[in-house]
Swiss-Prot record:
Domain of life where this protein originates: Archaea
Name of this chain's protein: UPF0179 protein MmarC7_0952
Pfam families noted in UniProt: UPF0179
Organism encoding this protein: Methanococcus maripaludis (strain C7 / ATCC BAA-1331)
Similarity section: Belongs to the UPF0179 family.
C-alpha cells in the first residue's frame, strides 16, 4: 500500500530506498510534521515510487523537502533454510552469528525489518556459512499490520 510523506529534496528520487528512523527534535514545531512522520513506521525500509515537483521549506533538510509516494521495499535477506518457504509469513529473527566480518553478516542481520514479512521468492544462489549454518537467500516484502 502506498503512503504519502515528505523527504529531503536531494534524496527524493524515484527508486531510492530509506529506513525510517523517526522524527527529530527539530521536527516538533513544524507544520508538516504530521505528513512527514505519521504515515511511516519506525524501522521500516521504504522505496520511493513517485516524486511530486513542489518544494517545501524544512529546518532539517538544507534544500527543503518534496512530497513523495512510498511503499514498503522488497529486499533480500538471508535466513535459516528450514524457514525459507515461498509465500509464508514470518516474524524476523536474525541468524545466530557473531562474525561481523563475514560477507553475509549484513544480510543475516538486516536493518529495516520491523514486524512481519512475506517470503516472495527463494533465490537460487548458494549461501556459504563459515559457522556451518544451513542458510538461504530470500526476497521479502513487509506485511502491513
Amino acid at each position: 500500500m502506498k503512503k504519502i510523506t515528505l523527504i529531503g529534496s536531494e534524496l527524493a528520487k524515484t527508486g531510492n530506498e530509506f529506513i525510517y528512523l523517526g522524527p527529530l527534535e527539530e521536527c516538533e514545531p513544524c507544520r508538516f510534521k504530521r505528513i512527514c512522520h505519521n504515515n511511516l513506521d519506525v524501522g521500516t525500509r521504504y522505496k520511493i515510487v513517485s516524486v511530486r515537483s513542489a518544494n517545501h521549506p524544512c529546518t532539517v533538510h538544507e534544500n527543503g523537502v518534496k512530497v513523495v509516494e512510498v511503499m514498503p521495499a522488497e529486499f533480500t535477506i538471508i535466513i535459516e533454510s528450514k524457514k525459507a518457504l515461498e509465500g509464508v509469513t514470518l516474524t524476523h529473527v536474525d541468524v545466530h552469528c557473531d562474525r561481523v566480518c563475514c560477507e553475509n553478516y549484513l544480510s543475516c542481520h538486516p536493518e529495516g525489518i520491523s514486524g512481519k514479512y512475506r517470503v516472495s521468492s527463494i533465490l537460487p544462489e548458494k549461501v556459504e556459512c563459515k559457522k556451518g549454518n544451513s542458510l538461504k537467500k530470500i526476497s521479502i516484502v513487509p506485511v502491513q499490520q
